């Protein structure tokens, strides 16, 4: 089984931060017996991310995406995955509850952008995030598992 890592973020692409996520994920993939053949970094651009994702879907069984899940307007990973896979985004009620709780215990008022993190592609399995507000997802296609 082949795997590929796509890291999303202009700050990584420009070298403003070191891409430690790719190294961590590659090590975990190897430990799980998955062959990681490709690693790609793409900036916060939906069109370029879609192109990279389509290419990955042609050549890899498992695709891990890291980044682009935040509450800002340039965080477009889930939206792009949904579009490429022909899925609509829908609200995950459990994620909405977790986001509300995250902010309530900190006595912070969430913004409208925070709620977009509860949107997930239809049919995706939602992964709770105990360290922040953006849940992960697993989306299965006929050929791929996208995480």
Predicted regions and their residues:
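An anion/phosphate-binding loop that grips the pyrophosphate of nucleotide cofactors and donors
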Residues: 60
